[in-house]
């Protein structure tokens, strides 16, 4: 797994895990806002642009990040955050290692498996994957995702770099993920965020995550769609981290 880093090496460690189909720039504004006070590490998840290996499973990505933390930071860090697929990987990390961080931020993580969605992914991408290489099609996707306009070049470049096999693999993994029973042993203070304008499955998932974690809080973000908090409102996200830590 490859990593992009910001900030001071001797400072408290914050690791942020990007959403599926995105990359480290998901958290670029957040990292720049926090870099004077923290050491920010942005892993590039397997199967994504600039990654060093294909995507296999959410569980394997979690294990890789745990190994990285064990190797470089004596088994624990200050805070880990994750969006969507990254949020699922974070939940898996917390399930595998209950005391790996002091704080955690789960944003828009799906934990209600859908076999119907799973079955549709391979046929859908088998027929339209080639269109991803065209800017007009990517702009339609980009607009639907509600990502701020200045990230389009990053989005187009990195989406084009994802293989069809990897894209199908991580989307299918995303559609089938459910919480492990061991999540209840997590000792971190967990903050769960979901946009008010997200779909019902995402809203229900946020409730399930909150109810499964004794030391957690849930905030529904008024007016926001999927992933908008960390992607489009990076300074607000960074300020929320400061508020959590100081509060």
Sequence positions of predicted segments:
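Conserved HGGG/HGGXW glycine-rich cap/lid loop of the alpha/beta-hydrolase fold
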Residues: 6-50
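Active-site loop/oxyanion-hole signature of alpha/beta-hydrolase fold enzymes
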Residues: 41-81
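Gly/Ala-rich beta-loop-alpha elbow adjacent to hydrolase catalytic centers
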Residues: 82-86, 90
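Flexible "cap/lid" loop of the alpha/beta hydrolase fold
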Residues: 95, 101-131
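Conserved alpha/beta-hydrolase catalytic His-Asp/Glu region
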Residues: 115-117, 131-184
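Short beta-strand/loop motif that positions the catalytic acidic residue
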Residues: 186, 192-194
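Acidic catalytic loop of the alpha/beta-hydrolase fold
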Residues: 196-201, 227
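Catalytic histidine-centered segment of alpha/beta-hydrolase-like enzymes
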Residues: 224-235
């Amino acid at each position: 797994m490859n990593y992009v880093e910001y900030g001071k090496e001797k400072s408290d460690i914050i690791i942020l895990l990007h959403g599926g189909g995105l990359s480290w720039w998901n958290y670029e504004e957040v990292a720049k806002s926090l870099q004077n006070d923290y050491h920010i590490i942005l892993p590039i998840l397997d199967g994504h642009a600039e990654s060093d290996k294909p995507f296999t499973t959410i569980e394997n990505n979690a294990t890789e990040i745990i190994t990285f933390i064990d190797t470089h930071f004596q088994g624990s860090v200050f805070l880990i955050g994750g969006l969507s697929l990254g949020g699922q990987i974070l939940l898996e990390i917390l399930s595998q290692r209950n005391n790996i961080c002091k704080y955690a931020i789960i944003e828009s993580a799906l934990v209600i498996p859908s076999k119907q969605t799973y079955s549709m992914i391979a046929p859908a991408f088998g027929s339209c994957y080639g269109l991803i290489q065209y800017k007009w099609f990517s702009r339609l996707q980009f607009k639907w995702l509600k990502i701020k306009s200045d990230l389009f070049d990053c989005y187009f470049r990195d989406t084009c770099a994802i293989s069809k096999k990897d894209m199908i693999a991580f989307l299918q993994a995303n559609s089938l993920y459910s919480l492990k029973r061991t999540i209840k042993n997590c000792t971190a203070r967990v903050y769960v965020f979901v946009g008010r304008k997200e779909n019902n499955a995402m809203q229900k998932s946020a409730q399930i995550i909150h109810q499964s974690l004794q030391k957690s809080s849930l905030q529904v973000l008024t007016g926001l769609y999927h992933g908008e908090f960390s992607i489009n409102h990076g300074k607000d996200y960074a300020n929320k981290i400061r508020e959590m830590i100081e509060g």
